[in-house]
């Protein structure tokens, strides 16, 4: 009887150790940290472009747009995966930035993977458009 009791106690101890070890690994492992990317609004050579014009990011990352040259600028998303107008509006910054180094940002958290295209309202006709590709 005492042999069975000792075996049960040892099995309980082993099981408890495995559970505690598994929880420690789960809580202490570092998930991939979210990144922040910078897109200049207007190139250093005063061209009406987003620099870089295309950017590939992961879900959870943030993009900051910095007013660089030849302002005013803004960021308006027109095409997003699934044609979700509410998501496009949430990511957009329609107010014009009128001073150097002003920043707006969008966090791409809980968004579907795919291509997101955007433009600058005053300079869209001049070709000031950009694209963000979100990996799944």
Curated annotation (Swiss-Prot):
CDD domains: Plastocyanin (cd04219). The keyword Thylakoid applies. One of its GO terms (cellular component) is plasma membrane-derived thylakoid membrane. It holds the Pfam family Copper-bind. It is found in: Cellular thylakoid membrane. The keyword Secreted does not apply. Its cofactor is Cu(2+). InterPro entries: BlueCu_1, BlueCu_1_BS, Copper_blue_Plastocyanin, Cupredoxin, Plastocyanin, Plastocyanin_cyanobac. Keywords: Copper, Electron transport, Membrane, Metal-binding, Signal, Thylakoid, Transport. Residues 35-136 form the Plastocyanin-like domain. GO terms for molecular function: copper ion binding; electron transfer activity. Residues 1-34 form the signal peptide. Participates in electron transfer between P700 and the cytochrome b6-f complex in photosystem I. This is Plastocyanin. It comes from Synechococcus sp. (strain JA-2-3B'a(2-13)) (Cyanobacteria bacterium Yellowstone B-Prime). The lineage of its organism: Bacteria, Bacillati, Cyanobacteriota, Cyanophyceae, Synechococcales.
């Amino acid at each position: 009887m005492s042999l069975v009791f000792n075996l049960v106690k040892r099995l309980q101890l082993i099981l408890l150790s495995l559970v505690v070890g598994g929880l420690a690994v789960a809580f202490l492992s570092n998930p991939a940290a979210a990144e922040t990317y910078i897109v200049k609004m207007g190139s250093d050579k005063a061209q009406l472009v987003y620099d870089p014009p295309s950017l590939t990011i992961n879900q959870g990352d943030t993009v900051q747009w910095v007013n660089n040259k030849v302002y005013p600028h803004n960021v308006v998303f027109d095409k997003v995966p699934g044609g979700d107008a509410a998501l496009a509006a949430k990511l957009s910054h329609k107010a014009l930035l009128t001073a150097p180094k002003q920043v707006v940002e969008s966090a791409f958290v809980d968004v579907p993977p795919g291509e997101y295209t955007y433009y600058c309202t005053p300079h869209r006709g001049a070709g000031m458009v950009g694209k963000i590709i979100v990996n799944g």
